[in-house]
Amino acid sequence: KMYYLNGNIQSEISYKKDVRDGITRTYDPNGKLKVEVSYQNGVQVGVQKGYYPSGKLKIELPLDKNGLTNGIVKIYYPSGKIMSEKSYKDDKLEGTVKKYDESGKITSEEFFKNGNRIK
């Protein structure tokens, strides 16, 4: 664990045989969770999560064992409502990208193939 000068926790990092393994959490100076990342044998895997100072979820970023973005990246408004959903394959946009207003209504929808917009 690492701490800020004010005594609040700055980060918690799990190691296995001197290599990051498990959940790593980073906090702001007020002790609020900012980022949560899972590691397996030194590589980021699973869904990386970022948080607003309020504690509400800001972003979900799915990573594979190679550290590439694979899956649906979700970004949220500070209210907690979904702002956008972007489908990725091997770090490139692939499939549907949807954007929403704060009421939940879809404001735009685009389609991508291999990182290129097709519609």
Describe each region flagged by the PLM.
Residues 1-119:
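Glycine/tyrosine- and acidic-biased, solvent-exposed loop/turn segments at the edges of beta-strands
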